[in-house]
Amino acid sequence: MDVNPTLLFLKVPAQNAISTTFPYTGDPPYSHGTGTGYTMDTVNRTHQYSEKGKWTTNTETGAPQLNPIDGPLPEDNEPSGYAQTDCVLEAMAFLEESHPGIFENSCLETMEVVQQTRVDRLTQGRQTYDWTLNRNQPAATALANTIEVFRSNGLTANESGRLIDFLKDVMESMDKEEMEITTHFQRKRRVRDNMTKKMVTQRTIGKKKQRVNKRSYLIRALTLNTMTKDAERGKLKRRAIATPGMQIRGFVYFVETLARSICEKLEQSGLPVGGNEKKAKLANVVRKMMTNSQDTELSFTITGDNTKWNENQNPRMFLAMITYITKNQPEWFRNVLSIAPIMFSNKMARLGKGYMFESKSMKLRTQIPAEMLASIDLKYFNESTRKKIEKIRPLLIDGTASLSPGMMMGMFNMLSTVLGVSILNLGQKRYTKTTYWWDGLQSSDDFALIVNAPNHEGIQAGVDRFYRTCKLVGINMSKKKSYINRTGTFEFTSFFYRYGFVANFSMELPSFGVSGINESADMSIGVTVIKNNMINNDLGPATAQMALQLFIKDYRYTYRCHRGDTQIQTRRSFELKKLWEQTRSKAGLLVSDGGPNLYNIRNLHIPEVCLKWELMDEDYQGRLCNPLNPFVSHKEIESVNNAVVMPAHGPAKSMEYDAVATTHSWIPKRNRSILNTSQRGILEDEQMYQKCCNLFEKFFPSSSYRRPVGISSMVEAMVSRARIDARIDFESGRIKKEEFAEIMKTCSTIEELRRQK
């Protein structure tokens, strides 16, 4: 069913069609090769914006550091990072004055969180810089490695599982003269294969102990690893993003908890809410400005863009903000919160993989690791790279670059939003003390500014004052990229406002289609995406019906499950035709078994198995939903699963869908090639960890990782739980006497083995 796209626009007002001009169809661009160049760009740019600051040397690591705080006031429109401490503190004081008690209350909320958070909070998140292996790892593995190293170095505060205790260990680790770590390495040997008698390379993974002195350890603890940000649409150049190690993460988490708590209480903050809630919040601010600008006042809105938000922010400024926000709070609390900005003032950026050189004539390739950039002869590089390396050389230590100013992407989104809102807050008439006044919205580096004044000159004066006030705290509004309109039309965080928010449907386009998890999940996710867009994004009934038909078509092509009575030949059609012919009630077959599609826009909320259950042949039901079916490795079945869908911008978001487990809910097996690499040792650790956690969850189904309290180990807890459960089951007649005896015997054996160990 091919559709002529112009038909979709016959009755669409022009402003609703803006979304079709977005670069959101097709595959997003990915980066290939090394991110070293992008990282050097970031480091060099950040230093350039703060170049008039003071240089100092870190006494512990020897890293040169640039401090632009309270530097010269800007004389031109170039972006700069010279924030003035007294201005930031004053903005904080005024924010508190307009919102009495806001800081106090947020501190109390955060204190509670600090005392309750468990260390497993740090296992969330994807890739994390693992300082023990000097590369990225899944968060859970990186945390396990860190705790293991701490333990072998006599740091044991984290045994109790509170995050705050783990952070105590981090602080102590920085005072140690040396740390002993375990690293993985590969050995290659040539051996003769007995079967084929050929020589083969055998790889073995070894673990070796290595001592790291205080300076090297500090450098690693303060290192942010960098990667290239992938899948960014609408940009010509790629850019670098950072991933911090486990030492920094916990501290950042607490600072962001505090800032989030403040943002929730600020009407101008676009974080931490999202979706419809965010739209409602924004619409309120706009309504307020428009009602107040009756006939006498003009009201204009700037769709704002800031130049290099992260690179002009400064951790020292954040330290000043935290010091102000937590005044009158207990000393321990102030200390915990001030560590993150202090660590960021001393951060090091890891330059990534380095450069790859190829010689076309000699068919040679060689990797120049980042560590060599400090000493290598520059004649091998092209001019632009040569300039970058020359500029960054004074900052290099062991393949990392000292980067004191700037924030790196996405680390303190909430706290930087608080700073932005504090400037918006100064637009009230009682602060401007003149005829113009402003308000607006702030979400991380994105902002919309609404200025009201009696005439155009007043609007201009208001914008100028806002611009200059921002400069004082290191925020640089871009005059080239911001534009101004009569209030009622603007864009903020990709929401388009035109007398109300227009659905920007194109942003959802990438999440339509077949996800590729398995037949069962894909069907469920596909219809849920359509349902959600009907609810949230003005997807009309006709378009939704069309989207559904296109989805079913796409799904059948993906899984080669065309209807049993079709003429299309695929490698599955022989089996599916046979099934079709044997089935009495053909309407009961799932689409993935060659059945018809029974979905329409009225029943998208019902999982397909439930929709067709009454129509199924009995033996088909038996095969489809049989947990003993040998062809299915079953996940634990939960009623709701989470899928990761890719909206067009922003992070992948998690979306819930109904999960009915059938023989179609298979789990693909892990690719074998990883087993021959140096990752193998890590993979085995990870599987071990996974198995233990799964086993533990079997015993404590409601645990969700709240470890048993007290001093018992996980094994002891599981044994005692097994005994209690067995006794209850035996007494209620659920298990026989023999089974009960066997369980008791097994428990005793386990305890005996532990004692011998």
Curated annotation (Swiss-Prot):
Signal peptide extent: none
Post-translational modification, as annotated: Phosphorylated by host PRKCA.
Predominant location category: host cell
Sequence motif Nuclear localization signal, residues: 187-195, 203-216
RdRp catalytic domain mapped to chain residues: 286-483
Pfam family, one: Flu_PB1
Any one of the GO BP annotations: DNA-templated transcription
Reaction catalysed by this enzyme: RNA(n) + a ribonucleoside 5'-triphosphate = RNA(n+1) + diphosphate
Function per UniProt: RNA-dependent RNA polymerase which is responsible for replication and transcription of virus RNA segments. The transcription of viral mRNAs occurs by a unique mechanism called cap-snatching. 5' methylated caps of cellular mRNAs are cleaved after 10-13 nucleotides by PA. In turn, these short capped RNAs are used as primers by PB1 for transcription of viral mRNAs. During virus replication, PB1 initiates RNA synthesis and copy vRNA into complementary RNA (cRNA) which in turn serves as a template for the production of more vRNAs.
Quaternary structure (record): Influenza RNA polymerase is composed of three subunits: PB1, PB2 and PA. Interacts (via N-terminus) with PA (via C-terminus). Interacts (via C-terminus) with PB2 (via N-terminus); this interaction is essential for transcription initiation.
Family: Belongs to the influenza viruses polymerase PB1 family.
Protein name, per record: RNA-directed RNA polymerase catalytic subunit
Species of provenance: Influenza A virus (strain A/Memphis/1/1971 H3N2)
